[in-house]
């Protein structure tokens, strides 16, 4: 996609790379599907970078505005899917 991901310039380069991978995984869940463990592993790393619920909601809102994809909905779907199954929105 051709849009700018929500990034915090206080994050380290490694954290920014992780966040971009996480955003790409959310896109993949919507566009093609992604293995549950891959998405949940990136979500766990996302939560290490963004531990605050309020900040998570803010990032989700910003991401949804630029992409049309909801982080919250994708993660909720992943939690419902069995292990080793595809998460597809």
Swiss-Prot record:
SUPFAM superfamilies: BH2638-like. Belongs to the UPF0223 family. It comes from Bacillus cereus (strain ATCC 14579 / DSM 31 / CCUG 7414 / JCM 2152 / NBRC 15305 / NCIMB 9373 / NCTC 2599 / NRRL B-3711). This is UPF0223 protein BC_3961. It holds the Pfam family UPF0223. Disulfide bonds: none annotated. HAMAP family: UPF0223 (MF_01041). It comes from the Bacteria. InterPro entries: BH2638-like_sf, UPF0223.
């Amino acid at each position: 996609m051709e849009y700018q991901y929500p990034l915090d310039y206080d994050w380290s380069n490694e954290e920014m790379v992780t966040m971009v991978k996480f955003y790409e995984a959310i896109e993949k869940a919507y566009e093609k599907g992604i293995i549950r463990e891959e998405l949940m592993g990136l979500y766990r790393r996302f939560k290490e970078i963004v531990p605050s619920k309020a900040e998570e909601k803010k990032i989700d809102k910003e991401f949804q505005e630029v992409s049309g994809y909801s982080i919250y909905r994708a993660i909720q779907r992943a939690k419902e899917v069995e292990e080793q199954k595809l998460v597809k929105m």
